[in-house]
């Protein structure tokens, strides 16, 4: 059953990615992508971004204006600031309600497509052998554990295969993270050495100038 083997591996990989990046991060990414499409909330999201830019611009200008020396200008900016703030809060409240519903729907679909699908596969194919072990290579208790709970004795059950996939994915993920950290650390070290080499001639030149000045004195 190569297709079932690959399906189990893919589901476990998706679960690992969700756990690694976090559900909130994925929800925010999907929400931003959703608002880029011609959806009912895309216009509201665009207006909110526009209001936010105007609000920040007015706020910066108001903070840069003295309320004592330029009171008339400051008061006008203050009224604009308060008006934009109220509009921004109303827009944010409306979008937050929609986003909450969106997050709930996405979280439900994500669970059904990952953990729910994994549980369904493990239940539906619990009596089916993923593949068979070479006869006589493993003791009875090992064959029993690998076929647990309901697969034929001497075979690999879907539960055992799922655990093996999870272990391999975790090991590969940790190895990739370690390699990336090592490469970034090596680059940082090389850049630090280059910076030190550039500083040494500058220090030497500065010391030479100081000595020359002392001799002249």
Swiss-Prot record:
Membrane-spanning segments: 5-24, 111-131, 156-172
Localisation per UniProt entry: Endoplasmic reticulum membrane
UniProt-recorded Gene Ontology molecular function terms: protein-membrane adaptor activity
Coiled-coil portions: 43-97
Region (Disordered): 195-217
Keywords: Coiled coil, Endoplasmic reticulum, Membrane, Transmembrane, Transmembrane helix, Transport
Protein name as it appears in the record: Protein get1
Family: Belongs to the WRB/GET1 family.
Organism: Sclerotinia sclerotiorum (strain ATCC 18683 / 1980 / Ss-1)
One Pfam family per UniProt: CHD5
GO biological process: tail-anchored membrane protein insertion into ER membrane
UniProt cross-references to InterPro entries, sorted A to Z: Get1, Get1_fungi, Helix_hairpin_bin_sf
Cytoplasmic face of the membrane: 25-110, 173-217
UniProt membrane topology term: Multi-pass membrane protein
GO cellular component, one term: GET complex
Protein's job: Required for the post-translational delivery of tail-anchored (TA) proteins to the endoplasmic reticulum. Acts as a membrane receptor for soluble get3, which recognizes and selectively binds the transmembrane domain of TA proteins in the cytosol.
Lumenal compartment segments: 1-4, 132-155
Quaternary assembly: Interacts with get3.
Major subcellular location class: endoplasmic reticulum
